[in-house]
């Protein structure tokens, strides 16, 4: 950690979480001068412990993969998801085709510090304990940031000017909330999370290839879901996510029934009662012991209307947040970080205009967000067992970019109509929910063998009628094919080099090569 914040910088990054550390590292490895300001002194606590397999190739690109492997974080072979108490759980298998494809469950204080220290080793000038007080803009261009004022706990203050800004300030989202005022909240994902840590739990599917996978379960009263995530430090993260209104209702009921209890006692009682509404999770808890204290946060899903502008980029939670479900947070942080770095490098190197670079970043972050949003909305549709109208929470332009190849499958024809309809979106949600279709590992593998090339994850999408004709009365094959097809829209994002290096957005794709990182015009 460096001490004296300089008075000027070429590229300045606000925030040392995954998005900020990653963007800064990528840019520093390209030879650019980068300083990073982080308000906390690491390590610091953070929630969001479950990762996707996609994080591994992201870290490989910055030579950090081995550090992740060697740290000792808990292996995540897949994820078990029980959305319906009358059906067996679904399972997303990460390692069936490649044992090295396992993800990790991480203690975020350790993972985030690992990334920040790696950034420093790669040449980023890191300053911790530095709070950004105010961002200043060009007089002749009121949305182009040119400097900021910072402060420390010892009352020292200063100003640093810069040419480029990456705002990875987390949910505070300095640029988005204070200056651009372009944050939009999703009405259908206004939730509250309450969680804590347990010791002495059992594990999911011991003695199988699924052993110790995290468990996610819908509550039987349809008010939310619960998570069970084993960690390498001997604890298990156990939390409940509730619809905000249901959370308020339950607390109000407990307060009226238990007037002699404190707010913290009522919160603990509500938490324990909600865990009882997840019978599969209760079995995994067994005789475990609750440790420490409960924590809570408002899990309000939101996005910015734009993630880039003249000489600035938004990345990670500073721009958008979906929901803890599907563990998309770190993936979207790294996606935003890489896109921010790639488009800044492209603009500096003259690969495109700054306006074109901004357009690429806006679309890249927007489509990645929308892909996961649709899966999450599909899951919540099942959890709540109702035809919730969600059209107003999905930007039509981003829907087109995210699922342009999916619309003909949903509609059952080659020509998509002009507009996005509520019926089409509901069909998409149903389709995406098959990511977690319940299958047994042995029969699933047997079905895969019977399907042959149809089971290729990189093959073309198949519509429902085609799947029905191909599988007939073979229900296991039908479920397997539904699941494979539902994962295809997300599958391409799991390999960041392929996704960034081949997906054409607004006539450009990313040149994923260290030293010449940028955009290539098609």
Swiss-Prot record:
Binding-site list for FAD: 16, 19, 49, 330
Pfam families associated with the record: Trp_halogenase
Enzyme Commission (EC) number: 1.14.19.-
Record GO biological process: secondary metabolite biosynthetic process
Keyword Oxidoreductase attributed: yes
Annotated binding of chloride, by residue: 328-329
SUPFAM superfamilies found in the cross-reference section: FAD/NAD(P)-binding domain (SSF51905)
Disulfide bonds: none
Key words of the record: FAD, Flavoprotein, Monooxygenase, Oxidoreductase
Single GO molecular function: flavin-dependent halogenase activity
Biotechnology: Melleolide sesquiterpene aryl esters are cytotoxic secondary products with anti-cancer potential. Armillaridin shows therapeutic and radiosensitizing effects on human esophageal cancer cells. Armillaridin induces autophagy-associated cell death in human chronic myelogenous leukemia as well as of hepatocellular carcinoma cells. Armillaridin can also inhibit the differentiation and activation of human macrophages and thus might have potential to be developed as a biological response modifier for inflammatory diseases.
Top-level taxon in the UniProt lineage: Eukaryota
Reactions catalysed, as given in the entry: melleolide F + FADH2 + chloride + O2 = 6'-chloromelleolide F + FAD + 2 H2O + H(+)
Biological function: Flavin-dependent halogenase involved in the biosynthesis of melleolides, a range of antifungal and phytotoxic polyketide derivatives composed of an orsellinic acid (OA) moiety esterified to various sesquiterpene alcohols. The halogenase catalyzes the transfer of a single chlorine atom to the melleolide backbone, resulting in a 6'-chloromelleolide product. The enzyme acts on free substrate and does not depend on carrier-protein-dependent acceptor molecules.
Misc remark: Armillaria species are both devastating forest pathogens and some of the largest and oldest terrestrial organisms on Earth. They forage for hosts and achieve immense colony sizes via rhizomorphs, root-like multicellular structures of clonal dispersal.
Family (UniProt): Belongs to the flavin-dependent halogenase family.
Protein name per UniProt: Flavin-dependent halogenase armH1
Source organism of the structure: Armillaria mellea
Gene (name only): armH1
